[in-house]
UniProtKB/Swiss-Prot annotation:
Membrane topology note: Single-pass type I membrane protein
One Gene Ontology biological process: negative regulation of protein catabolic process
Cellular compartments annotated: Golgi apparatus membrane; Endoplasmic reticulum membrane
Pfam families hit by this protein: Ig_TMEM132_2nd, Ig_TMEM132_4th, Ig_TMEM132_5th, Ig_TMEM132_6th, TMEM132_3rd, TMEM132_C, TMEM132_N
Glycosylation sites: N280
Protein name (record): Transmembrane protein 132A
Region of interest called Confers cellular localization similar to full-length form, as start-end residue ranges on this chain: 671-1023
Amino acid sequence: MCARMAGRTTAAPRGPYGPWLCLLVALALDVVRVDCGQAPLDPVYLPAALELLDAPEHFRVQQVGHYPPANSSLSSRSETFLLLQPWPRAQPLLRASYPPFATQQVVPPRVTEPHQRPVPWDVRAVSVEAAVTPAEPYARVLFHLKGQDWPPGSGSLPCARLHATHPAGTAHQACRFQPSLGACVVELELPSHWFSQASTTRAELAYTLEPAAEGPGGCGSGEENDPGEQALPVGGVELRPADPPQYQEVPLDEAVTLRVPDMPVRPGQLFSATLLLRHNFTASLLTLRIKVKKGLHVTAARPAQPTLWTAKLDRFKGSRHHTTLITCHRAGLTEPDSSPLELSEFLWVDFVVENSTGGGVAVTRPVTWQLEYPGQAPEAEKDKMVWEILVSERDIRALIPLAKAEELVNTAPLTGVPQHVPVRLVTVDGGGALVEVTEHVGCESANTQVLQVSEACDAVFVAGKESRGARGVRVDFWWRRLRASLRLTVWAPLLPLRIELTDTTLEQVRGWRVPGPAEGPAEPAAEASDEAERRARGCHLQYQRAGVRFLAPFAAHPLDGGRRLTHLLGPDWLLDVSHLVAPHARVLDSRVASLEGGRVVVGREPGVTSIEVRSPLSDSILGEQALAVTDDKVSVLELRVQPVMGISLTLSRGTAHPGEVTATCWAQSALPAPKQEVALSLWLSFSDHTVAPAELYDRRDLGLSVSAEEPGAILPAEEQGAQLGVVVSGAGAEGLPLHVALHPPEPCRRGRHRVPLASGTAWLGLPPASTPAPALPSSPAWSPPATEATMGGKRQVAGSVGGNTGVRGKFERAEEEARKEETEAREEEEEEEEEMVPAPQHVTELELGMYALLGVFCVAIFIFLVNGVVFVLRYQRKEPPDSATDPTSPQPHNWVWLGTDQEELSRQLDRQSPGPPKGEGSCPCESGGGGEAPTLAPGPPGGTTSSSSTLARKEAGGRRKRVEFVTFAPAPPAQSPEEPVGAPAVQSILVAGEEDIRWVCEDMGLKDPEELRNYMERIRGSS
């Protein structure tokens, strides 16, 4: 139909409305053409349950406008899951079930790079040193397993092997992950020939994971081959010729600067501090006062230039502090060619640390420096500077935070429950040892609107008050003089939520009555003729049901305050948060509809309401969706049946996120074996172009029956939850067709309600290529003798849920019973038609296009009629010239006759019927107007009147010609017998005065008065 409509051509209409009419027709045809080309597919799928097991945090995700996915059908279903937290202890399982069948598979490991092999562990690698020197040729890398903790003694943790690649060769070293922390440090010594004396080179670091081995250390030998592309990158490390000095410079005043080492010192270690002096310093005496706590001593003061300065050292011991006084005297002058502002080394002060530091914990030793000049107060506070020395028995190299996850999905605004990520702080020693120092650190979040940190610095969290998300948000940690930063990605929901309903208008289902209090039109009391009818009177019409899903996009804002968002998975992906917000979702008007289990909307009575989700923190509305329940009636057109004889499952990894997993399950429908159990998946197709799985409806409201053409081919199945199932006792090589019918439940299946609402057919096994599968009937039809299993029937069988299952042989039906049930079906249809309340139906896009085309044709017809009326009115205004004399008389036809026969006039007058006698009058030629000539009056109504005027003028020197004007009046309805047929009626036009007709008399040659008088009498007699 669409092709014919789109391809039809019409002639271009004329008139001023023609172009507009063509445009309207073109638009209407285009609407119909687009609708035909974009007919959507039915959103059907196999309603099997897909769930993740042993996954700490995961979400179902879907693309916008793609649910179910395009590859779903009655026999298959696809779902995409997003796993956020890693699973280092146990691999999660994905289970697919459709009772009584179930299967499960292990989720494949993550793939961090497209070319890499999947690994079962999620590892974070941190390089401790950015550069190494020949004095310290060790490259240290910390490996951390993200996820939960492990109990002590866990023997399943793997080994991490570090690979260093240099143009001069390769080096390898491994470590085994330690329980509790789930971390280890590889300390790889780089060969000395890799270092260059003149330039800086670079070595690339990568790692691989391998199972732990027996023996010391738990890892294999270091003799490893090149890992190739399977190695995961760590980064690079610089190989420098010498160790750059690590120190800090602090000015004591405008002329003197203090340079101190910037590294922890160990007990018993000797170190020095240096004083720098500007060349423009002119004082000859300088005193330096140093105060130290117990455990630290000043051993010596040495001038850097003994020829210019001398130093004297004095020590004073106190109860809490030791004071050292160094007096410097100038011994010579500075060289004149040096720059005045240039700094030069002036004095070296040596310190030593005592061996005992308090049990291996790093401590600080404050050192107070103060300059004194002659004439200055000795305790001037403005010249004091305090320097803290970190003293530790361990060679601490770095402070590193260990987080269980590097990204956080902020669902706290939806649930009101804070989300936490545990954090631990460890120090890395020179020998590769790890020590936790979480209790001693300080911390601060760089952006509290995105992420917060706990007071104990052992976790970062979101509480629901955060306003946005971000990528790479920073949290700073510090311990003594060591600092470290942790960067995480926080995904925040974009509100409002999207609430998707499978049907936003719920209507009554014609003929489907269920037990319970009346929620729709009440049944008439006259139907209660017996006990069964009284029970059926308590039934009411079933309303449609709709599935509901709550979705939300998650995004991260840029840290620089820009507006460009980064979406989780992509801008067209949504996370299913139904399991989180279902406790906070409700129907605004519970009388109109109700929400069952947070997943199914049930219509109660006609009305308009909405489904809304309120925030548990502020009671604000997070999302809202309108819902209408009408007393319009729809019919169940057919049952779409899919037999399930087993479940198969496949899993695949996605590319948008490392935790993306897509699961697809199929229903196995091979030829059933004897005693094969078969489950039936049912979809209800309604007349309002919607479909719904039978799982949306209460099992007690479904009266289902299954029949087979072969007697004894099927038996009732055991309990299967919400699914309908049978046991096939045997099937031929070509398969077995099953007929499924939907009935009202048994208490409401009385009298006129015994006819099936709809039926469908399923084929067990693959149908032959030459014999197509039976079509799904749209109306109930009785099958030939067969075997039938009924659900919700009268017979009770253990194992059914909601309705009971029975088995009966259906070998023959009486004609009387069939006719009776057909009559009841017709009565039911008539009654339901009377119960229907006129209401606007759902209009599809195709119907809209047809209505638009019909409207265009109506407009064209209207324009044609208007043009016709305008045409008629326009030409009615144009009147003939002689209509002014008598506008009511019909317009005669004027004929002109030319001739030379003078007797023609007499011949015409003889044909005229004689009129009534006229009075005598004088000749107009003589009287000159003394009397009035008779005037020609119109004839009686319906009569025939003709008038002729003959005009002849005399031609010079020749024969006169005549011009005769003959006027024919409309023909009479019937001619008189005496009048000859075909004789024209002629009347002469006479005038009253002599002046008017004198020239006529002269032209006719009548000059004698007697001739004129006779002529006039003849004229009067003829008129």
